[in-house]
């Protein structure tokens, strides 16, 4: 039995979970998320209102889908109650970010032009100062993907560490060429 998959998912107050066959919908104070469960895995509610994820047998694929499904549904419950946030920071002389509203950011990252990033559905941006900002939303996957796409615009380079990085990320530094 999967160690993660067998754990019941506690549903906090204010969160409504609808189960309709293979379709799961989670509604909470921050929004609504839905998910279609792959065929051999079944989702049900127990007497206390917790969600149970079960598999028919110990086939390899079913074992992996069991833990995955439980984790995805748990992430949905956390997303609609607390939400997710990825913090990023910019390092480099003249590198900065400007907010063009909660759905758009403008980056000056050493290119000949500013780079404008639009937020996908369900994502908002918050700018703390010109070198720190965050990506927020209820869907963990979309928040992480949006943050990764922004980081990809100008990855931290290994010599001076200039670029966009996650908060707390350690950039591996290289030694420059030795002078005479």
Curated annotation (Swiss-Prot):
GO terms for biological process: cytoplasmic translation. InterPro entries: Ribosomal_uL6-like, Ribosomal_uL6-like_a/b-dom_sf, Ribosomal_uL6_a/b-dom, Ribosomal_uL6_bac-type, Ribosomal_uL6_CS. It comes from the Bacteria. Disulfide bonds: none annotated. GO terms for cellular component: cytosolic large ribosomal subunit. Gene3D superfamilies: Ribosomal protein L6, alpha-beta domain. Belongs to the universal ribosomal protein uL6 family. Part of the 50S ribosomal subunit. This is Large ribosomal subunit protein uL6. It comes from Cutibacterium acnes (strain DSM 16379 / KPA171202).
């Amino acid at each position: 039995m999967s160690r993660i998959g067998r754990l019941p998912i506690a549903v906090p107050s204010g969160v409504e979970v609808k189960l309709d066959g293979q379709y799961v919908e989670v509604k909470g104070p921050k929004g609504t998320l839905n998910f279609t469960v792959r065929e051999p895995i079944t989702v049900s509610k127990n007497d206390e209102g917790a969600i149970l994820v079960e598999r028919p047998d110990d086939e390899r694929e079913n074992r992996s889908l069991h833990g995955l499904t439980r984790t995805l549904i748990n992430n949905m419950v956390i997303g609609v109650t607390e939400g997710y946030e990825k913090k990023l920071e910019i390092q480099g002389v003249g590198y900065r970010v400007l907010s063009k509203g909660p759905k758009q950011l403008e980056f000056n990252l050493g290119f000949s032009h500013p780079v404008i990033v639009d937020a996908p559905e369900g994502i908002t941006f918050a700018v703390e100062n010109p070198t720190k900002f965050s990506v927020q939303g209820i869907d963990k996957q979309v928040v992480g993907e949006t943050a990764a796409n922004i980081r990809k615009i100008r990855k931290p380079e290994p010599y001076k560490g200039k670029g966009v990085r996650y908060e707390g990320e350690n950039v591996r530094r290289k030694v420059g060429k030795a002078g005479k």
